[in-house]
Amino acid sequence: VDTCDEAALRRVFEKYDFGSVIHFAAYKAVGESVAEPLKYYRNNLASFMNVCALMKEFGRPNILFSSSATVYGEPDTLPVTEQTPRKPATSPYGNTKQMAEDILHDCCAAYEGLHGIALRYFNPIGAHPSALIGELPRGVPQNLVPYITQTAAGLRECLSIFGDDYDTPDGTCLRDYIDVVDLAKAHVAAVDRMTQRRMKEAYEIFNIGTGTPVSVLELVKGFERANGLTLNYKIVGRRAGDVKAV
């Protein structure tokens, strides 16, 4: 179902009796959002407003929103906490996450019985231990790890690292990487928190990360050491919308 299609989404609410919604439906490529902002504003915000409106109408009480650490913009200090002020986002993608958080906050404040949690992901990474679920995207990857693994497997000739002139120890961007299994467990815990009414407020925010930043080069070198191989990579210019560290 296209969640931008209100009529189609309404039929889902009419057919199924569910109390909680986890909202993942969004485009997420920072660079693409800079080139095609309207695509991101339409898909990421119109769909979310449809979900919120129907939850209000049908009396569905719990919504978990997939947010992002991009809402912190270019933070002044690391690590960021939930009390760190949001700063202007550096991309339309980040803007959509900030705006959706505001929408959810306002809806939870206005509509009695509606509860929401926003999980601010840092950088999901890895695969399920079964190896049956992992990062092998169709088309062009939007995350670093698939580029690394595809380069290692010979599917890509070279790995591009965007910028080595940032004010970081090795000049490449710093990111906080969170294992996807831990991220999945965080969603289960958040839904349980809502359904068991353990929330302190109708709307809450939680960061989902480790608190330890790793540079792009550190990740590449770590992959090389763990697998006993050398990756073919090159340094290219900075990518629009990227922040130095988060």
Regions found by a protein language model. Give the residues of each.
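Rossmann-fold scaffold of SDR-type NAD(P)-dependent oxidoreductases
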Residues: 18-24, 65, 207
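Short-chain dehydrogenase/reductase
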Residues: 41, 89-98, 134-146, 176-177, ...
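Active-site Tyr-X1-5-Lys
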Residues: 74, 90-127, 146-156
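C-terminal substrate-binding subdomain of Rossmann-fold SDR/epimerase-dehydratase oxidoreductases
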Residues: 145-246
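Conserved Rossmann-fold cofactor-binding substructure of NAD(P)-dependent oxidoreductases
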Residues: 1-20
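Conserved Rossmann-fold NAD(P)-dependent oxidoreductase catalytic core, especially the SDR/UDP-sugar
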Residues: 23, 49-92, 107-117
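A hydrophobic alpha-helix adjacent to the NAD(P)-binding/active-site core of NAD(P)-dependent oxidoreductases
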Residues: 12, 40-41, 55
